[in-house]
C-alpha cells in the first residue's frame, strides 16, 4: 500500500474534498507509475483522478460504523511519534 495514502473514513471533522482529491492523485500515480504524466496522457490521468475522487467520496459517505470518530489531532500526534521512533 502506498504510504502517502491515509485513512480518511471515520474522522472528525470528516474528510474534505481536498483530502480525497489528494489521496486519489496518489492512487492514480501509484497505479500509472507516473508522478507527472506526459502531454499524451495528461487528459486521461486528470480524468482518472477525478473519477477516483468521486468514487472515494461515495465510499466514505456510504460506510457506516459504530466506532467513535477519530480525532485528527490525536492521530497526527501518534503519526509524529511513530515517525520519530522510526527515523530518530
Model-predicted segments: where are they?
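A charge-rich, low-complexity, intrinsically flexible signal that marks solvent-exposed coils, linkers
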Residues: 1-88
